[in-house]
Curated annotation (Swiss-Prot):
Matching NCBIfam families: KdgD, PRK03620.1
EC number: 4.2.1.41
Species name: Acinetobacter baumannii (strain ATCC 17978 / DSM 105126 / CIP 53.77 / LMG 1025 / NCDC KC755 / 5377)
One example of a Gene Ontology biological process annotation: D-glucarate catabolic process
Keywords: Lyase
Family assignment from sequence similarity: Belongs to the DapA family.
Keyword Ubl conjugation on entry: no
Protein name per UniProt: Probable 5-dehydro-4-deoxyglucarate dehydratase
């Protein structure tokens, strides 16, 4: 799959980041992860991101990274495209991008570099080097210490033909408006804020109709129902789900730092697709929070 084909795929539909399965010792559980992907693939996501943020990319060793990507590619071959997370220091991101391409992934999501702040010139060089190291498509993840301004994005679209996507987690509506209006369809735009469904309507109005759904990990039927309602401007359905499910979900998520990932794994366990514990420095939900989440999920009915 070339970069343009990937761009077309991520320009429409719902995207999701499967959690990464660990056993009770905290080791990668390949068979459980493969079963998870087999369960999720038929629900209709346009692409799945292996080893993304929700997949605890930040905690994987080099060997585990390769095993996660290979398992995802092999399991989903012919059914749904796999986009790999890649990031950290520039040379590490290049190594991971090359490895993902070698293993048959269809592109990468370029995750933020680690810890240090960087100038726009430094970020441009970082993205350029990663893009130049591979042939397949690269999606830039605009978040945390890794945020590009409009001028930098323009320069990179001219330098890097295989830079095909821009995922925004900044929530800066004015900036996203400027980007979509100036860059146009040179890039595909993805909403990337936590619990993205709550922000999906305003992002759609900006020309960013696609987003990644974390809750697809445990309520794929409802996640697709929400996306299809959003797509058809069925505000009655989207408003009902936001009020009755997503806003209460956010209240649980915000009880502790790191719950944005821990809560997703807990949800998967509640619906019968246990992915094991999260790895430190994340912590699993408390029993009380787990029970509150289970009660909320139960209101949606079978998935």
């Amino acid at each position: 799959m070339d970069a343009l084909e990937l761009k077309n795929i991520i320009s429409d539909g719902l995207l999701s980041f499967p959690v990464t399965d660990f056993d009770q010792n905290g080791d990668f559980n390949k068979s459980s992860y493969a079963k998870r992907l087999e369960w999720l693939a038929p629900y209709g996501a346009s692409a799945l991101f292996a080893a993304g943020g929700t997949g605890e990319f930040f905690s994987l060793t080099g060997n585990e990274y390769s095993e996660v990507i290979k398992t995802a590619v092999d399991t989903c071959k012919g059914s749904v495209p796999i986009i790999a997370g890649a990031g950290g220091p520039t040379r590490q991101a290049i190594e991971q991008a090359k490895e993902a391409e070698r293993l048959g992934a269809h592109g990468i999501l370029l995750m933020p570099h680690y810890l240090t702040e960087a100038s726009q010139e430094g970020l441009i060089e970082h993205v350029k080097q990663v893009c130049n190291s591979v042939d397949f498509g690269v999606i830039f993840y605009n978040r945390s210490v890794s945020r590009l301004n409009l001028d930098s994005i323009q320069k990179l679209t001219e330098m890097c033909p295989n830079l095909i996507g821009f995922k925004d987690s900044s929530g800066q509506i004015d900036m996203m408006t400027a980007v979509t209006q100036t860059i146009g369809d040179r890039l595909s735009y993805l909403g990337g804020l936590p619990t993205a469904e709550v922000f999906a309507a305003p992002y759609k109005a900006l020309g960013c109709p696609v987003y990644s759904s974390a809750v697809f990990n445990f309520i794929p039927k409802t996640a697709m129902e929400f996306y299809n309602a959003l797509r058809s401007d069925d505000f009655e359905t989207t408003n009902r789900l936001i009020k009755d499910f997503f806003l209460p979900l956010i209240k649980i998520r915000d009880r502790k730092s790191g719950y944005a990932v821990s809560m997703i794994k807990a949800g998967a366990k509640i619906v019968g697709h246990d992915a094991g514990p999260v790895r430190p420095p994340l912590s699993d939900l408390t029993q009380a929070d787990y029970e509150d989440l289970a009660a909320l999920i139960a209101t949606l009915g079978p998935q």
